[in-house]
Each structure stands twice: as structure tokens, then as C-alpha cells.
């Protein structure tokens, strides 16, 4: 049975509050045989103090050996089996920036990329251009590709190297089962999109035509001169998060994909002031709305971005920046405070990985364990053991006294 259907009849409304902090891609690896991970290297006195008062463990977001994308990783943390509830990155990003998807449309996540001779990929993120440069390039593509063979094409800025394309159905629905253009490595050319079923053949044609026309339109660009696609999606549908858990839930995040996912499961997405991933703005939003909700999903992105860039020192710094503001979160006195990642992004690999992520749960009803720091190694000593991602929400609900007894 789907764990959601087990939890749903047990959930009850209470006044207790849950704060789930997701440090995106927080899990790491040592750079050397006898070295430390980014978490272990970081100076985190506040996380250490919290860990000494909490329960720790490790979480596999999908299954052993499976490297999660951000979408499946978050769905798992929210209690949705990522093998059952599948959604492409395109829909998450589109919804996150306020784009309405209609039945039959397909949204796809795009990366601006740097291409060299023979179309070989030099940089999958085109040097992470500024948001202003992103908007400039999107405007150029909009002028060059308003439609393809009668299919309307909409192009939207997201942030840095990220953008979203929506192919609008004009009759027959477009299929979303298409292979990625993005090979997720450098030194090779973009892949040709291939349909995996007849309904997706037109979508694959549209994608390949877009790639060709985009490269022509960007031929005068020195760095942002190619596009990569992944994460095709039509309109997804999920059981409502608030109804499952009897919560009023809010999302505090900066990046569109995470706001989109939260919106799709039914959370309210709160406005955040300041620069993207500005932690001060997120703290302010949490304080402002603290009395309006009983569940908060609070997201930190840069622990992932720095890992993807292969920048060990920068990832350590982002962890330390979060640690510095942790006392402000604790001062709100949530009944349950959870700190976890949606996947690991070791700087050593410069990509997501299959390694379990540390899980911390602090509540007045938790049993203390032997873990003394919030690190991968210390989490192995924790009383929570190795858990599936879908176990996290039931554990938080139980620690908040929001679950009734199961059975007689």
C-alpha cells in the first residue's frame, strides 16, 4: 500500500509546528582518502549543538544506488513515492514561474550551454550567466522561434543558465516521453531527442527543430551559444499535501523549480525578498508568516550549486552561512525541526550522487542518540538508522504528535 494512504486516516490537526529545512545537495565526499566531507570540514557550532540534542540518521531518497534528481528527492521527502509519482523538471519550473499548463501541452527545462568546435559541449551551464544575460538571450530566442511548424512556442527566463520552453498543443495532445538532449557531461555534442512512444514523436521533432534554430540564433554569442533540454512533462496531478497530513503548509524557496513542486502538491508559496537564495530574506519570510501555518518547507539552494560546480571550499562556506543563521530558526521554537537534503552533490563528482543524506530530527519527544555533529559519518551513529525518503514525513508527524494510533 502507498504510505500516503496509511498516513492519511491517522493524521490529525494540532497546534504544533514543523519546520523542514532542505539543504539542497548537502551530502558530500572527501576529496582525499583520509579527508573530510564538506559538512565535516565546515565550522558549524550551531548545527553541532543541535545535533547533540537530536536524533540523526541517513536517508535514501529513491532506492539503494539510485541517484535522485531534485524533483524525485523532494517528492520523497514530502511523502510521495518517487517511483509512483513522476513529474518532469519542465512542469516544475513552469509552474514555479507562474506559467499555466493546459492539457496536451509539454514543458521542458532548458540549460543555456557553451558549445565549441563540432558542437562539443564546453560548459553545460554557460558559465552561469547573470539573470540579465539570461533575459537578453531569451528575448533573442523568442524573436527567432515564436512557433515551429504551426505549434506555438513559449520561452521563459528562469535564472542564471536555466530557462523553460512550453510547446502548446493545438489539437492532438503532445506526448512527453522524449529522451534528453542534455548528456549531462562535457566533451560530447548535445544528443538528438528521441520519442519513446508514438504520441511523443511530434514533441521530439519540435525539440530537435528548436535546438537547431536556437544555435543559429545564438551563433554570434561567445559563451551562451547552445541549449540543452531535459525533464519533459505534461500537466501532473498529486494528492493534496495539506489534505493528506491535515496541515496548512507553506514553501519558502527562491528557485522556480522548488516553488513549482511545492505549488503542485498544494503548499502556499510565500514571497521572499532579496537576491536569489538570499537566506536573510527567507528568515524574514519565516518570521512574518510563523503564526499563519503549521508546516514550513524552507529551502537552501547554494549547497547544491557549489557542489555541482565542483567547488569544495564554496560549498563549505555555504554550509557555514546556514549555520550562522540557525539560531534565528531555533528562536521560533518549532515543535519539530528537521534538517535534511534532497540528494547528495559531492564536489568531488560535481554532480548529484546516490549517497544517502544526513537526516536530523529535533523534538521534545525524540530520543537522544550518539551523534554529536550533523555530518555523514556522525549520522551513521544515529538512532534513526538508514531510512527511505518517504519515511521522513511520518516521522515528523509522529514527533509533532499529529498521528493517531494505527489499529486497535
UniProtKB/Swiss-Prot annotation:
It is an enzyme of class 5 (isomerase). Keywords: Glycolysis, Isomerase. It catalyses: (2R)-2-phosphoglycerate = (2R)-3-phosphoglycerate. Gene3D superfamilies: Alkaline Phosphatase, subunit A. InterPro entries: Alkaline_phosphatase_core_sf (IPR017850), ApgAM_prokaryotes (IPR023665), Metalloenzyme (IPR006124), Pglycerate_mutase_ApgM (IPR004456). Pathway: Carbohydrate degradation; glycolysis; pyruvate from D-glyceraldehyde 3-phosphate: step 3/5. One of its GO terms (molecular function) is phosphoglycerate mutase activity. It holds the Pfam family Metalloenzyme. GO terms for biological process: glycolytic process. Its EC number is 5.4.2.12. Catalyzes the interconversion of 2-phosphoglycerate and 3-phosphoglycerate. Belongs to the BPG-independent phosphoglycerate mutase family. A-PGAM subfamily. This is Probable 2,3-bisphosphoglycerate-independent phosphoglycerate mutase. The lineage of its organism: Bacteria, Thermotogati, Deinococcota, Deinococci, Deinococcales.
Amino acid at each position: 500500500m502507498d504510505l500516503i494512504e496509511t498516513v492519511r486516516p491517522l493524521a490529525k490537526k494540532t497546534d504544533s509546528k514543523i519546520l523542514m529545512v532542505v539543504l539542497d545537495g548537502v551530502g558530500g565526499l572527501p576529496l582525499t582518502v583520509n579527508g573530510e566531507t564538506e559538512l565535516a570540514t565546515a565550522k558549524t557550532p550551531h548545527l553541532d549543538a543541535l545535533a547533540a540534542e537530536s536524533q540523526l540518521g541517513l536517508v535514501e531518497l529513491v532506492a539503494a544506488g539510485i541517484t535522485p534528481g531534485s524533483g524525485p528527492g523532494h517528492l520523497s521527502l514530502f511523502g510521495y513515492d518517487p517511483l509512483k509519482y513522476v513529474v518532469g523538471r519542465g512542469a516544475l519550473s513552469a509552474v514555479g514561474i507562474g506559467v499555466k499548463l493546459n492539457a496536451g501541452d509539454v514543458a521542458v527545462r532548458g540549460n543555456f550551454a557553451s558549445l565549441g568546435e563540432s558542437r562539443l559541449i564546453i560548459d553545460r551551464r554557460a558559465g552561469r550567466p547573470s539573470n540579465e544575460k539570461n533575459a537578453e538571450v531569451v528575448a533573442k530566442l523568442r524573436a527567432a522561434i515564436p512557433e515551429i511548424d504551426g505549434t506555438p512556442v513559449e520561452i521563459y527566463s528562469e535564472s542564471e543558465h536555466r530557462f523553460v520552453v512550453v510547446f502548446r498543443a493545438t489539437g492532438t495532445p503532445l506526448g512527453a516521453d522524449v529522451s534528453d538532449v542534455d548528456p549531462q557531461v562535457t566533451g560530447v555534442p548535445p544528443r538528438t531527442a528521441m520519442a519513446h512512444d508514438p504520441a511523443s514523436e511530434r514533441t521530439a521533432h519540435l525539440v530537435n527543430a528548436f535546438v537547431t534554430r536556437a544555435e543559429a540564433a545564438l551563433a554570434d554569442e561567445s559563451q551562451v551559444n547552445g541549449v540543452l533540454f531535459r525533464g519533459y512533462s505534461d500537466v501532473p496531478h498529486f494528492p493534496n499535501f495539506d489534505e493528506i497530513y491535515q496541515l496548512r503548509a507553506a514553501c519558502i524557496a527562491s528557485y522556480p523549480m522548488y516553488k513549482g513542486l511545492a505549488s503542485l502538491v498544494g503548499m502556499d508559496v510565500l514571497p521572499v525578498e532579496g537576491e536569489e537564495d538570499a537566506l536573510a530574506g527567507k528568515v524574514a519570510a519565516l518570521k512574518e508568516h510563523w503564526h499563519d501555518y503549521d508546516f514550513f518547507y524552507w529551502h537552501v539552494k547554494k549547497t547544491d550549486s557549489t557542489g555541482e560546480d565542483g567547488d569544495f571550499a564554496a560549498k563549505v562556506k555555504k554550509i557555514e552561512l546556514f549555520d550562522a543563521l540557525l539560531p534565528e530558526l531555533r528562536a521560533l521554537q518549532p515543535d519539530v525541526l528537521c534538517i535534511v537534503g534532497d540528494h547528495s552533490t559531492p564536489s568531488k563528482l560535481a554532480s548529484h550522487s546516490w549517497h544517502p543524506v544526513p537526516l536530523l530530527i529535533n523534538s521534545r519527544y525524540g530520543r537522544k542518540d550518539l551523534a554529536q555533529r550533523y555530518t555523514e559519518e556522525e549520522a551513521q551513529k544515529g538512532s534513526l538508522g538508514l531510512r527511505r525518503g518517504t519515511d521522513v514525513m511520518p516521522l515528523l508527524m509522529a514527533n509533532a504528535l499529529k498521528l493517531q494510533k494505527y489499529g486497535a
